[in-house]
Amino acid sequence: MTSLPASLRDPAWNGRIATCIVAIVILWPMLTMAEFKPWILFDAQSLQATWQFLASFFPPAHSLEFLEMVAYSTWETIAMATAGMTLALLGAIPMTLIATERLSISRLGTGRIARWAMALRQLVRWLLILLRSVPELVWALLLVRIVGLGPTAGVIAIALTYCGMLGKVYADILESSDPAACDSLLRNGSGRLSAFLYGALPASASELVSYTVYRWECAIRGSVVMGFVGAGGLGQRMDESMKMLAGDELATMLLVFILLVACADGVSAMLRRRLE
């Protein structure tokens, strides 16, 4: 077997092979520790349980009383996600103004940021890290113990986690925007808020709104998941139906959930198109 001439050999071939070997060496112990055994899904007992579970879905529950309850829970889920996002925005916007170096007034004179401003900025950044490092499901689990069952825990949980996420990403977007307009306003005596509204925001509005809408879509999905720990909404009703082994009710709520996410995705796509 003749070897390829040097001019036809892929110079990155050895690197790709080495990368694959390293990835396998790292990934295999993780899969072993996670007890990843997908073949269990295909043994006789699992297949029988799967068939029985799916068979209980048909026909989906469609009584008027049940559909009214599902409609109310769906609206509660949307309200929970929207209220949580609104509170998150109220916290994220002022923290973004502090955390963004692009909006610093003290750096314009000497090129250095004042120590007190740097300390405050680092404090806010650490607060954003703290908020987003705890998933909303964990916040909901903790808050249910404090405020009790219901959507209040879900609203606060979304507000806390998404405040950290929005503040971090907003600051990154503003830092990567064109600094010319913002710097010009600050040098001519403009305040931080005015520089943000008339300098940084117009250049980054499309990206900021696009990410905000995406997070609202994520908040709707998260609201359903938080219902499983007692935070109300469609998820709590799904949890109750699963405990009662009511597959027909679960099927209806799954269909509603899929339609809800599809509608949220449609609204998100429409807003993005209007911003382009």
Describe the predicted segments one by one.
Residues 1-86, 90-94, 98-119:
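N-terminal, non-cleaved signal-anchor transmembrane helix
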Residues 63, 117-157:
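Generic hydrophobic transmembrane alpha-helix motif, especially the helices
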Residues 71-79, 121-131, 213, 217, ...:
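Alpha-helical membrane-interface segments at transmembrane helix boundaries
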Residues 81, 85-93, 97, 137, ...:
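Hydrophobic positions within alpha-helical transmembrane segments of bacterial inner-membrane proteins
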Residues 93, 97-101, 169-176, 180, ...:
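Membrane-spanning helices that line or support transport/gating and their immediate boundary helices
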Residues 142-145, 149-200, 206-215, 266:
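Membrane-cytosol interface at the C-terminal ends of specific transmembrane alpha-helices
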Residues 145, 221-257, 276:
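Glycine-rich helix-loop "coupling/hinge" segments at transmembrane-helix boundaries
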Residues 210, 251-276:
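C-terminal transmembrane helix and the adjacent membrane-cytosol boundary/short C-terminal tail
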